[in-house]
Amino acid sequence: MLAVTNIPYPSWLNPADNTWQLVAATLVGLMSLPGLAVLYGGLVRKKWIVNTMLMVFVGFSATLVVWMLWGYNLAFGPQSHFGPTGSFWSGFIGHFTPLSTAGAEQGQAVSGANTLIPFHFPTATLAYFQFVFAAITPLLFLGALVGRLKFKAWLLIVPLWITLVYCVNAALLWGGGFFAQKGAVDYSGGYVIHLSAGVAAFVGAAIIGPRRWQDRENAFPSNLMMVAVGAGILWLGWNGFNGGDPFYAGADAASAVLNTNVATAVGVLTWLLMDMFFSRQKKPTFLGAINGMLCGLVAITPSAGWVNGTGAIFVGLIAATIVWFAWNYLSRIRPFSKVDDAMGVVYTHGIAGLVGGLLVGILADPGMVQYGVAGRHFKGAGSFSVGGWFYTHSFHQLWEQFLAALWIIGWTAVGTTIVFTLVKFLLGGLRESDEVLSLGDVAIHEEEAFPEPTFGEPLMTPSHIHPDNV
């Protein structure tokens, strides 16, 4: 028999950190599959359930392929240095190189611009963790486009958008690029993910055009139970979303998880109270609670590890209040009233992400320390903190957050316009025909989520699994 010996881990590998990072990544992945697939499936009309859920699966898959071939190193690899050190172009983007060798995957993970100390887990762990963040971003703005977007168009939009928009934004804020060097922070993606998704949703929906008026007039959720399941997966999955971003299983991860749940709970209650006292119906609604949940989750994302518990309460309260008024009043004003955002992505992700990012510059507590960072504002070896106006009486951090937000909004709008216009040119249009739009899933996929055969007729069976074809 072979003698039992200790596994020869590399000296830099910490099993606890590696395990937590993989668990956190899996939680974030579950937010997409099945989280968003089930949530969206419950929100759309019955005839669009299959198409919408399949687009979520396809977007997730396409992003992973892009991520392995060039996306990861483009966003988080060594900087290309197109300009002088310290300039915008010196920290603009990484390299178009694949992550495909044994050494690349199993070596110690490091940040491309050396803004973080070397991690205690392999590059494969970091690459997968960053992938699930990249994957969920186009899936978020998909929510604004459902019910009319060509399936073939989606196959092209995802890889192009990830490459042109997401990787650039991630490199500039997370990969040690220009805005990271200037001091802007985005703890888990309020800007890189949610603000950019909101902008892409607005631009994409404007280019594609609205749904058929019949579909807009009858846009009732097909299944609130599916919505509840999907929303629950999102909420608890967010523990990995924000809790994994310290990259270590430490106190800062625990604080991020607690703050995330506090802000979310406050967001739910705030939206319901707004509905009860200020809406036309004066009644609490389940969909309203889901909107409040999203506001809290999204708004705390850029600040989860920077604010204390009291700050988290204010983040949830302020974000839910602002987004509630925006949803109910801004949506009536041009140009918002002319853009058919099917699921309110512009509001619950775009505006909530912007509010949360700016609140970092106001509510960030210098006493909240993030460890493992090899850069500025040291509070002991390998750690730093961020101070908002409330504690420092300085608007410096708020200014840096504002400038980063302007970039995200501007570049995402330009990049999304380029991607959608190019795909429209290549395919001769982005919308399905009116005939297809009237039928939905049956016309596009020959499948239905809930088939209802008429009396005396057989259940509709997709042609590719029909007995005659077996």
Model-derived features: where do they sit?
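Glycine- and aromatic-enriched membrane alpha-helices
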Residues: L2-V470
